[in-house]
């Protein structure tokens, strides 16, 4: 049985992760951690850590995980470029699954988006829309950013130059190479994501809607189990699910 450290235990996702770990017959909660608590004692007694806390905690977690040779599943979003680079650097020493979304359905959306972009992208106007609950603190969501990165790569565009975050005022006709990004917040929406490919005469929409955080939590536990025995490296949920081989 794999012993798992759950960080950010007081948060919504921390609670969901704890429940998912408890429900899985192959895992147990070895320890939990929250802001202000010492990390080493909690990490030392576990086989792997699942982190859905806050991006500002990532540097501390990475340092302790590397020092103690512990695999990590990182689901926190909103990282700065420096923090993302720290994750890449740490993956040279330990195996890390780093994903913006651990839902199996969302990762199918990632795969489908890449394929659709390869078929349609060059001739379509592309827009990404996401909606989350009123308490979410970052925008756009990590999942929406991943979708835009997938789209940019699939149609050979630069993310920074192509993505436009919302529109206001007299912006003029839509440039063909734009990828529009739109964030909505309200209510208790767990997470909705839509990719739109619009051309003259037709429109393709790919949509995923999550109704429970348990879908993310169960995917993160699946990733933690998959990490056991892996070589150091930076992995994604597409690796965990085998989608990168399709």
From Swiss-Prot:
<dbReference type="InterPro" id="IPR036291">
    <property type="entry name" value="NAD(P)-bd_dom_sf"/>
</dbReference>
<dbReference type="InterPro" id="IPR023940">
    <property type="entry name" value="DHDPR_bac"/>
</dbReference>
<dbReference type="GO" id="GO:0019877">
    <property type="term" value="P:diaminopimelate biosynthetic process"/>
</dbReference>
<feature type="binding site">
    <location>
        <begin position="75"/>
        <end position="77"/>
    </location>
    <ligand>
        <name>NAD(+)</name>
    </ligand>
</feature>
<keyword id="KW-0963">Cytoplasm</keyword>
<dbReference type="Pfam" id="PF01113">
    <property type="entry name" value="DapB_N"/>
</dbReference>
<keyword id="KW-0521">NADP</keyword>
<dbReference type="GO" id="GO:0005829">
    <property type="term" value="C:cytosol"/>
</dbReference>
<feature type="binding site">
    <location>
        <begin position="8"/>
        <end position="13"/>
    </location>
    <ligand>
        <name>NAD(+)</name>
    </ligand>
</feature>
<keyword id="KW-0220">Diaminopimelate biosynthesis</keyword>
<comment type="similarity">
    <text>Belongs to the DapB family.</text>
</comment>
<dbReference type="GO" id="GO:0016726">
    <property type="term" value="F:oxidoreductase activity, acting on CH or CH2 groups, NAD or NADP as acceptor"/>
</dbReference>
<dbReference type="GO" id="GO:0009089">
    <property type="term" value="P:lysine biosynthetic process via diaminopimelate"/>
</dbReference>
<dbReference type="GO" id="GO:0050661">
    <property type="term" value="F:NADP binding"/>
</dbReference>
<dbReference type="InterPro" id="IPR000846">
    <property type="entry name" value="DapB_N"/>
</dbReference>
<keyword id="KW-0560">Oxidoreductase</keyword>
<protein>
    <recommendedName>
        <fullName>4-hydroxy-tetrahydrodipicolinate reductase</fullName>
        <ecNumber>1.17.1.8</ecNumber>
    </recommendedName>
</protein>
<keyword id="KW-0520">NAD</keyword>
<comment type="pathway">
    <text>Amino-acid biosynthesis; L-lysine biosynthesis via DAP pathway; (S)-tetrahydrodipicolinate from L-aspartate: step 4/4.</text>
</comment>
<keyword id="KW-0457">Lysine biosynthesis</keyword>
<feature type="binding site">
    <location>
        <begin position="142"/>
        <end position="143"/>
    </location>
    <ligand>
        <name>(S)-2,3,4,5-tetrahydrodipicolinate</name>
    </ligand>
</feature>
<keyword id="KW-0028">Amino-acid biosynthesis</keyword>
<feature type="binding site">
    <location>
        <begin position="99"/>
        <end position="102"/>
    </location>
    <ligand>
        <name>NAD(+)</name>
    </ligand>
</feature>
<dbReference type="InterPro" id="IPR022663">
    <property type="entry name" value="DapB_C"/>
</dbReference>
<dbReference type="Pfam" id="PF05173">
    <property type="entry name" value="DapB_C"/>
</dbReference>
<comment type="function">
    <text>Catalyzes the conversion of 4-hydroxy-tetrahydrodipicolinate (HTPA) to tetrahydrodipicolinate.</text>
</comment>
<dbReference type="InterPro" id="IPR022664">
    <property type="entry name" value="DapB_N_CS"/>
</dbReference>
<feature type="active site" description="Proton donor">
    <location>
        <position position="136"/>
    </location>
</feature>
<feature type="binding site">
    <location>
        <position position="133"/>
    </location>
    <ligand>
        <name>(S)-2,3,4,5-tetrahydrodipicolinate</name>
    </ligand>
</feature>
<dbReference type="GO" id="GO:0008839">
    <property type="term" value="F:4-hydroxy-tetrahydrodipicolinate reductase"/>
</dbReference>
<dbReference type="GO" id="GO:0051287">
    <property type="term" value="F:NAD binding"/>
</dbReference>
<feature type="active site" description="Proton donor/acceptor">
    <location>
        <position position="132"/>
    </location>
</feature>
